Curated annotation (Swiss-Prot):
Family affiliation: Belongs to the elongation factor P family.
Gene (UniProt): efp2
Predominant localisation class: cytoplasm
Function: Involved in peptide bond synthesis. Stimulates efficient translation and peptide-bond synthesis on native or reconstituted 70S ribosomes in vitro. Probably functions indirectly by altering the affinity of the ribosome for aminoacyl-tRNA, thus increasing their reactivity as acceptors for peptidyl transferase.
Segments crossing the lipid bilayer: none
SUPFAM superfamilies: Nucleic acid-binding proteins, Translation proteins SH3-like domain
Protein name according to UniProt: Elongation factor P 2
Pfam families linked to this entry: EFP (PF01132), EFP_N (PF08207), Elong-fact-P_C (PF09285)
Any single GO BP term: peptide biosynthetic process
Length: 190
């Protein structure tokens, strides 16, 4: 495995700490007036999702984690899970529902997802940052709603995601949604 020095730490770098894969979320280089310089990093565990802070003396090195990403298309979902396919090799991968809990509301057939693999095993599935989804259910906008200060209303998309949309959005319309926050971005014109 490749080792990286503290001078090579950067946000997004995948490292192995205590045998577990982590991604660096924040890296602060600290040079105190007295004593040795050090790096204080905030890292997120890929397996548990827990965020911790670690400190490394300047010049120390740690192993990089064997974490890689693979782009795959969602073919279909069934009672077992979701089946993804690599567009280049046509290799198919079944991911069980227990690994899809965080993205279940964003699963849409024929969409490209990022599968995060650690030592060859899928540890998470990441949806695209922005998705175009159809509004399946929402209350009609009532005239005068904006006068009372109410400009958003709840809506359910065709994937089952519950989001807040502006009152002018109606059922059947396509909207752009940020999957990181679950928020409405814009109306999509066809």
């Amino acid at each position: 495995m490749v080792r990286v020095s503290t001078s090579e730490f950067r946000v997004g770098l995948r490292v192995k700490i205590d045998g577990q894969p982590y991604v660096i979320l924040q890296n602060d280089f600290v040079k105190p007036g007295k004593g040795q310089a050090f790096n204080r990093i905030k890292v997120k565990n890929f397996l548990t999702g827990r965020v911790i802070e670690k400190t490394f003396k300047s010049g120390e090195s740690i192993e990089t984690a064997d974490v890689r990403e693979q782009q795959m298309r969602l073919l279909y979902t069934d009672q077992e899970g979701a089946t993804f396919m690599d567009d280049e090799t046509f290799e198919q991968e079944l991911i069980f529902w227990d690994k899809l809990e965080n993205v279940r509301q964003w699963l849409l057939e024929d969409t490209i997802y990022t599968l995060v693999l650690y030592n060859g095993d899928v540890i998470s599935v990441e949806p695209p940052i922005f998705m175009e989804l159809t509004i399946a259910e929402t209350a009609p906008g009532v005239r005068g709603d904006t006068a009372s200060g109410r400009v958003l209303k709840p809506a359910t998309t065709n994937t089952g995601a519950k989001i807040m949309v502006p009152i002018f959005i109606e059922e059947g319309e396509v909207v752009k949604v940020d999957t990181r926050t679950g928020s409405y971005e814009s109306r999509v014109s066809k």
